């Protein structure tokens, strides 16, 4: 039975193989192009050198003979180039048939379309190492990720604990303020009731004072009436007393 790390490494190895094949094909195509260009340059240099040596006209030749020699040299040069171009085209056809006969999975187009740039970097790094190193790297990466998650979890837990402590402190201060506010409200209500009672007493006293004033005024009026009546009755009594001795 294969472990999870081995099952993760196998598709990476397959993709790396396809990538290596694509790189080899690209390198072989570049080498063939370079080889063709190099051969063409060499053929051109050799032909020009051979024609210069074989068909160099004599100094005493006439102009008509010189033209004929030039035409012969050009014809032989063209024939030589045609034969070499046929050979080169045959070689190119053979290379193209070899690339076409390969499987579609080996073509660079499918490989480049199936593999992303990030995977290419990972595969290039993995190609320098053997499978045991890859497995160890995968395990180390998983361990690093686990340690990072643990660190993140610890940091989040500490932050949550600190926030809970702060909220508990705020709640305690809020409760103390609430209790003091309620006490102040009770005292204010008590004082307000006392003030209302005092106002009622004050109003009652004012009413009593008014009643007393009214009674006092009535008493004063009665006294005055009595005085006035006594004044009217006293002269009559005196006149009677004077008349009595004469009789």
UniProtKB/Swiss-Prot annotation:
Biased segments, Polar residues type: 129-146
Physiological role: Involved in cation homeostasis and in the regulation of the cation stress signaling cascades.
Keywords associated with the record: Cytoplasm, Nucleus
Principal subcellular localisation of the protein: cytoplasm
Protein name (Swiss-Prot/TrEMBL): Protein ATC1/LIC4
One GO term describing the cellular component: cytoplasm
Region (Disordered): 95-146, 226-247
Subcellular location: Cytoplasm; Nucleus
């Amino acid at each position: 039975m294969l472990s999870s790390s081995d099952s993760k490494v196998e598709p990476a190895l397959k993709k790396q193989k396809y990538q290596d094949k694509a790189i080899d094909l690209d390198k072989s195509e570049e080498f063939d192009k370079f080889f063709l260009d190099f051969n063409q340059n060499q053929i051109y240099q050799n032909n020009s050198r051979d024609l210069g040596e074989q068909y160099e006209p004599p100094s005493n030749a006439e102009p008509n003979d010189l033209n004929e020699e030039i035409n012969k040299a050009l014809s032989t040069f063209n024939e030589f180039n045609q034969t070499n171009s046929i050979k080169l085209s045959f070689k190119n056809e053979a290379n193209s048939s070899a690339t076409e006969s390969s499987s579609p999975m080996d073509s660079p187009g499918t490989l480049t379309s199936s593999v992303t740039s990030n995977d290419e970097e990972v595969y290039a790094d993995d190609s320098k190492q053997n499978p045991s190193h890859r497995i160890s790297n995968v395990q180390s990466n998983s361990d690093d990720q686990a340690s990072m998650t643990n660190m993140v979890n610890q940091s989040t837990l500490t932050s949550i604990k600190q926030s809970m402590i702060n909220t508990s402190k705020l709640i305690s201060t809020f409760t103390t303020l609430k209790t003091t506010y309620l006490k102040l409200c009770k005292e204010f209500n008590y004082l307000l009731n006392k003030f209302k009672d005092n106002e009622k007493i004050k109003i009652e006293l004012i009413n009593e004072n008014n009643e007393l004033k009214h009674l006092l005024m009535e008493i004063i009026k009665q006294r005055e009436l009595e005085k006035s009546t006594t004044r009217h009755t006293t002269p009559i009594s005196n006149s009677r007393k004077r008349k009595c001795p004469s009789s």
